[in-house]
Amino acid sequence: MTVKKRSVRSERADPGDEPFLMVLRPLVEAFFAFLRKSDRHIRSLGLTPPQFDVIVTLGDTDGMTCRELSEKTLVTKGTLTGVMDRLEAKGLIGRIPSREDRRSTIIRLTPMGDDLFRQVFPKQVHYLKPFFEGALTQNQMKDLQYMLLKLKESFEKQ
């Protein structure tokens, strides 16, 4: 008697039918389209995207530690030190010993860095605004924010 072997493929649902796949490609494509436009505009302002991220994160604050800065920016820890060195060499940030913890340093914008923040941040917001408002209503933006935060949370807890 011969036992007919069932193929493994026939026992499983087709992976191409997974519902999340209909979202995956558009999500990634939207992200890359955003990066291309945003990065190009930031570079036209005379900054690299990591430099812009650090300046905008420090803007309107009293400064923060390196650890806080690395947690609040999208800049990797390995890149952050070099970015800060270059911004400090340009006179845009300063490093001040912390009063609370002598082992810690506070990074803050210099007056020149604050002036730059006040110039470039509104320009970037003004540049990006039509892309979002031309595609989504305010309610859709709120819904999208909620969904993206849920998705991020799902990836971070697993």
Question: Predicted segments — roles?
Answer:
Residues 1-45, 142, 150:
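N-terminal leader segment of winged-helix/HTH proteins
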Residues 6-9, 35, 85-143:
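Charged, amphipathic alpha-helical coiled-coil/dimerization segments
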Residues 25, 53-57, 81-83:
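Base-recognition residues in the alpha-helical recognition helix of bacterial helix-turn-helix
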Residues 31, 117, 152-155:
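A structural signal for well-ordered alpha-helices, especially hydrophobic packing surfaces
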Residues 32-76:
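N-terminal helix-turn-helix DNA-binding core of bacterial DNA-binding proteins
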Residues 66-67, 78, 85, 105:
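Residues within helix-turn-helix
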Residues 142-158:
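Exposed, interaction-prone assembly regions rather than primary DNA-binding/catalytic cores
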